[in-house]
């Protein structure tokens, strides 16, 4: 009797086992191995060297890159129907780019302008576009199909996408 019950339980549990399908499994596994190698051989040594950088300089670098994201965030706020947040984020960019010396200092936060993070993937999600399957992107890591397809638009909105060598030289002088 006990044996029949055990067989019955095993049979029932196999009926309801869920098969999780990864349509990009081969690509994802190969890309994961590539990313692991990239991390081990390049990114980890760079990160270890950067960890020795003084906190004040790290904060300035973080502020600089956060400032560059403000324009993209502002556009996505508009696309999501949040005009007041868009004005806030664009104001942050103008203030931090000018008074904050190219965004190295975050004066906008000091005067009460809150930092937001929005990207085109979030905009597409708000519009009802499903995320799609998981995908591992080379050098960028885990993502979804929606996020991966939103990245070119996000890059186009990035300030750095539109910078020329002359712009960089002007800033560095």
List each model region and its residues.
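Amphipathic, glycine/alanine/valine-rich membrane-attaching segments
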Residues: 18-173
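Sec-dependent signal peptide recognition
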Residues: 2-8
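N-terminal signal peptide c-region/cleavage motif recognized by signal peptidases
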Residues: 12-17
């Amino acid at each position: 009797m006990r044996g029949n019950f055990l067989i019955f339980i095993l049979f029932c549990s196999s009926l309801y086992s869920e098969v999780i399908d990864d349509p990009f499994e081969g690509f994802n596994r190969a890309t994961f191995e590539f990313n692991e190698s990239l991390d081990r051989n390049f990114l980890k040594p760079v990160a270890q060297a950067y960890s020795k950088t003084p906190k004040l300089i790290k904060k300035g670098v973080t502020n600089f890159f956060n400032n560059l994201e403000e324009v993209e965030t502002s556009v996505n706020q508009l696309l999501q129907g949040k005009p007041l947040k868009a004005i806030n984020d664009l104001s942050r960019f103008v203030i931090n780019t000018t008074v904050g010396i190219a965004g190295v200092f975050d004066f906008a936060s000091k005067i009460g302008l809150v930092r937001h993070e929005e990207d085109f993937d979030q905009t597409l999600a708000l519009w009802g576009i499903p995320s799609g399957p998981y995908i591992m992107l080379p050098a960028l890591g885990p993502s979804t199909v929606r996020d991966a397809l939103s990245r070119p638009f996000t890059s186009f909105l990035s300030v750095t996408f539109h910078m020329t060598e002359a712009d960089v030289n002007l800033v560095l002088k």
